[in-house]
From Swiss-Prot:
GO terms for molecular function: lysozyme activity. The active site is at D24, D112, E114. It comes from Dictyostelium discoideum (Social amoeba). This is Probable GH family 25 lysozyme 4. It comes from the Eukaryota. Gene3D superfamilies: Glycosidases (3.20.20.80). One of its GO terms (cellular component) is extracellular region. GO terms for biological process: cell wall macromolecule catabolic process; defense response to bacterium; killing of cells of another organism; peptidoglycan catabolic process; signal transduction. SUPFAM superfamilies: (Trans)glycosidases (SSF51445). The keyword Hydrolase applies.
Length: 213
């Protein structure tokens, strides 16, 4: 029994030690910005790659390169869909092919599912989401979903098809923990938590994120 308790204690401490803090960013950022964020203790960055206007973010390639040059080990990008553009199968490939053209070094593409720009028809929203997934899969992207219960349910209703992909959820309670998480959309376990917004210590705006390893 004592060995078992020691093992559990070790796992708990090891998990805490190996948790990661990071940022998500929606504006151009320099090497100095990322070096500052590393000095603040952040270890990963998720950078906007596609805007809700239906265009690739012109800053994404440079920001990814600057993050890598600064020494950020884990760099992803996120895609903010444009529902009114009506071309879900094309949006993911537009981003991925753009990044590939510049040999951008990144990991995942997170679909940002939020805002009031979606249709009031949940069936149409689900079809659009599935089009986004299909487009990203056609170019071999590693896909994740950013959302929250308060955003997902009004947009997608009871749809659970997104739950096969990792979940990055938002709850600005300021706590680096998944203890607040309640299942929704078919997800029972999240991958990343966005736990606060409003960071600006390094001259660039960012949100605070966390995940255990």
């Amino acid at each position: 029994m004592r060995l078992f308790l020691l093992l559990i204690t070790f796992i708990a401490l090891f998990g805490a030690i190996n948790a990661f803090s990071g940022v998500d960013i929606s504006q151009g950022s320099s090497v100095g910005d990322f070096q500052c964020m590393l000095n603040q203790g952040f270890e990963f960055a998720i950078i906007r790659g596609y805007m809700e206007t239906g265009q690739v973010d012109p800053e994404v390639v440079n920001s990814i390169a600057c993050a890598r040059e600064a020494g950020v080990e884990y760099v992803d990008t996120y895609l903010f869909p444009c529902f009114n553009c009506g071309n879900p199968q094309d949006q993911g490939p537009a981003l991925v092919n753009y990044l590939s053209g510049y040999n951008a070094n990144y990991g995942m593409v997170w679909l940002d599912i939020e805002s009031s720009d979606w249709s009031g028809d949940q069936s149409a929203n689900v079809a659009f989401f599935e089009g986004l997934i299909s487009g990203l899969q056609s170019v071999g992207a590693h896909i994740g979903v950013y959302t929250s219960a308060s955003q997902w349910i009004p947009i997608m209703g009871g749809y659970t098809g997104g739950s096969e992909f990792p979940l990055w959820y938002a709850n600005w309670d300021g706590v680096q923990s998944f203890d607040d998480f309640s299942a929704f959309g078919g997800w029972s376990t999240p991958a990343i938590k966005q736990y606060n917004d409003g960071g600006s210590n390094c001259g660039v705006g960012y949100d605070f994120n966390w995940y255990p390893n």
